[in-house]
Amino acid sequence: MRARPTLFIAPLFPLLIVGTSVDRPVQTVSQPSDVTLTVVVTGASTEGGTIGASLYSTADGFPGQVAKAAQTSARPRTAPVDSFVFRGLAPGPYAVSVYHDLNGNGKLDTNLFGVPKEPWGTSAKVRPRLRAPRFEEGTLNVTASTRVEIRVER
């Protein structure tokens, strides 16, 4: 009677699993990054209200869903030029949206069709008329500390 090869291999199967799991690289906890993105906001015509900026690391939520942003910041507008610094960024693609909340209600007001009634801007190089800019159009490849200027307009 011939011995089956599967009977010989079967007892070694648990060793194969253990061997492959030991060979995997150990994941380490990432250290905080010193990469920053400075966003300079220009073009707001009046002082007053609130100026806000949101940083997105994925297309999900860009440009208008602040709750899905990786980082966000807003403050009363008191100077002709505002800037925001986003710190501790992992190198990679990001997109930024900014708005000038003129009436201070905490959001970008839009008309019946969803078109903004208050000044806004993004890191996108295009400003589509019938849709919001896409994440891919506004992607900044941040690998070191970077500065970008975004103009807000109606």
Task: Label each region the model flagged.
Residues 92-98:
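A short tyrosine-centered beta-strand micro-motif
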Residues 102-110:
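Acidic, glycine-anchored loop motifs typical of Ca2+
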Residues 35-43, 53, 150:
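A short, amphipathic beta-strand motif
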Residues 86-89:
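Short, flexible loop/turn segments at beta-strand junctions in immunoglobulin-like
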Residues 9-19:
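Bacterial N-terminal signal peptides
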Residues 52-56, 97:
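Beta-strand signatures of extracellular beta-sandwich domains
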Residues 80-84, 136-138, 146-148:
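Short strand-edge motifs at loop-to-beta-strand transitions and within beta-strands
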